[in-house]
Amino acid sequence: MREPIVAIATPYGESAIGIVRLSGKGVLDLVKKFFKTKREIKPRYAHFGVLYDDKGEELDEGVLIYYKAPHSYTGEDMVELNLHGNPRILKRALELFVNAGARLAEPGEFTKRAFLNGKLDLTQAEAVAELISAKTELARKVALKQLHGELSKHIRPLRETLLELLAYVEADIEFAEEDIPTLTKEQVIQMVDKVIEGINELLKTAKTGKFIREGVKLAIVGRPNVGKSSLFNALLKEERAIVTDIAGTTRDFIEETLQIKGVPVRLVDTAGIRETKDLVERIGVERSKQKVKEADLILFVIDASQEITEEDLRIYEEIKEKDHIVVANKVDLGIRANLEKFKGEKIVKVSALKGTGLEELSEEILKKVGANLEESVNIYISVRHETLLKKAKEVLERFKEEFREKDISPEIAMLDLREASDYLGEILGEITTEDLLGKIFSTFCIGK
């Protein structure tokens, strides 16, 4: 069991309860020096008592819960001390335990110990951080599934298939003279193809994961006075942007966040894109163009009550290669625009003023970012997972080509299969380095 660590596990500030958490060798004896109860402390019981300082003066009263190894979050002996949530009390308790021999925990160190002690694999440990930082109900649901091992269930069988292949290759080398069962070339290719197929399915979730974690960057773009700011306000359901009939009212971008059926969206209302001699407006137009480049999805807004202009078509040419939705606004005034100019496009007709068509627009946004996320998402991969999966796939594609065309030696086959297996093992934390663990757990809050 490792040295004792201690941290305040609740957010800083005044509250009804504040928790001081300890884990490691001898933590119960350490805490008992200062926390006195009338009864013997038993694991998993709540014990009321008094916390005294190092001079024997009463500091606070509270409740102690002891978790005996290995039946704890970290897999070590743990103590959680529930005190009144006064920052001064919690800080003083922290000082007491540090002076008595505990070390201040590093960010994420409790979860790191849980991983090192086999209580969680690395994808589950990462899910703890995702769960704590979840900004939407959908993000919370998916993080909880991954904490329960949902992602691991998809990756571990792929690695086991590669390890099974490795075992056959090693047996072929070690017992070449003996009559043992071997796989045909076709069987090997089939097994590798099965792993590649599984990797491809996981890679499809990378974009979804990015959207759930960071939000979809959604830019509203169009010429001046087509109702971009009105649409911005309608989607936000509040009057955030100034709306007038004067072209060029919005001179700089405005950015807000909202949720569309559980998906976080970073919505940007851009300045109307046009040629202008006004210096301030020109700067706003350039900044708007930068936001267009950064956007995951563009809402290209036209005024359905007017003819399509050359300015509309010029902006459309600039954005049509990016993911976009054509939004015909102001349909409540009648449709005079020749929408055939956008032949082949799915055009969503809305009235930002009346609120019509907004539900259809929301559905179209979800389709563009990857499907109805609220119902279908069980797992998603992070950038770290995506990088390792792509590396594993690259190695397996190379192996398959060489195995089929060049009839590579068993020794070379072993190297490729081992490398691909190790990449998958790194996702699960079965292959790790201290640098990797330090990088992952440093993003956690202290006390978790």
UniProtKB/Swiss-Prot annotation:
Which cellular compartments is it found in?
Cytoplasm
Q: What are the binding positions for GTP in this chain?
A: 225-230, 244-250, 269-272
Annotated Mg(2+) binding sites: 229, 250
Q: Which SUPFAM superfamilies match?
A: P-loop containing nucleoside triphosphate hydrolases
Predominant location of this chain?
A: cytoplasm
The annotation note on the cofactor reads: Binds 1 potassium ion per subunit.
Tell me which PANTHER family the record gives: TRNA MODIFICATION GTPASE GTPBP3, TRNA MODIFICATION GTPASE GTPBP3, MITOCHONDRIAL
**What's this protein's family per the entry?**
Belongs to the TRAFAC class TrmE-Era-EngA-EngB-Septin-like GTPase superfamily. TrmE GTPase family.
User: What protein is this chain from?
Assistant: tRNA modification GTPase MnmE
- Originating organism: Aquifex aeolicus (strain VF5)
Q: Gene for this protein?
A: mnmE
